[in-house]
Amino acid sequence: MRLVLGVFLASLPGVLFAQDASRAVPGGGVSVPGWTGKIDANEERAGRTLNDAKFFKDGDTLHVTTGPAVAYWNPANKAGGDYTVKATFTEPKYMNLNNHPHPYGIFIGGNDLGTANQSYLYCAAYGDGRFIVRGFGPAAFRMNGFAGESNDAVHKAAGVGQPVTQEIALSVKGGKLECSINGTVVASYDKSALVTDGKLKSTDGVYGLRFAHNTEVNVTGFGMSKK
């Protein structure tokens, strides 16, 4: 029985690695005007703060280094009805701050952000070809399983320390919500499956950026368009 359990766990991406603890990033904090953020509740319970991750802008590029898992947003960035939010994420040195792949991506439908009742949905990519669709409502929820899914559209880094880039988009179109990565729709859900108790209050709301712990990513082309 123990052997069977061990084989099962070893088959799950990321389970082979011990969970690396979040670290404090020197010179951390949010220095992009108008923006703020919130780290995950479990990070707060462990004594981490928003200043343990670093978020700054250089030219047209947003630079993020975590630290604790975190969401960043500008309260002025709101979207409603049908829309698409997209950005390009570059991990300059894959897995340089962690011992296994960590994801990064976009969130939409942000309501009551920064409070204990916040809700939002995010789609995030890993540099190993996987993606996840998850959210908070306010408890964490998963839309595509424990470890996410692999998809050929998601770029894979050539190796540890090598760069990998993903273009990620979340779209609301009528009664559907779609996540696209590198131009391919990788997940599609009925809005009714997301706007419900324990998940989103609405797909209307603030949009922003989401990062796992101990990750270094550069973001370009972040914005929203109406369809």
Regions found by a protein language model. Give the residues of each.
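Bacterial N-terminal signal peptides
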Residues: 4-15
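Low-complexity, Ser/Thr/Pro/Gly-rich disordered linker/stalk regions
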Residues: 19-96, 176
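Secretory/extracellular carbohydrate-interaction modules
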Residues: 66-143
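Beta-strand-rich interaction surfaces with strong enrichment in secreted/lumenal proteins
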Residues: 71-77, 152-160, 208-209
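Extracellular beta-strand elements of beta-rich domains used
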Residues: 87, 220-224
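Carbohydrate-binding surfaces in secreted/extracellular proteins
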Residues: 87, 160-194
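Short, aromatic/His-centered strand-loop micro-motif at the edge of beta-sheets
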Residues: 141-167
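Flexible glycan-contacting loops in extracellular carbohydrate-active proteins
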Residues: 189-221
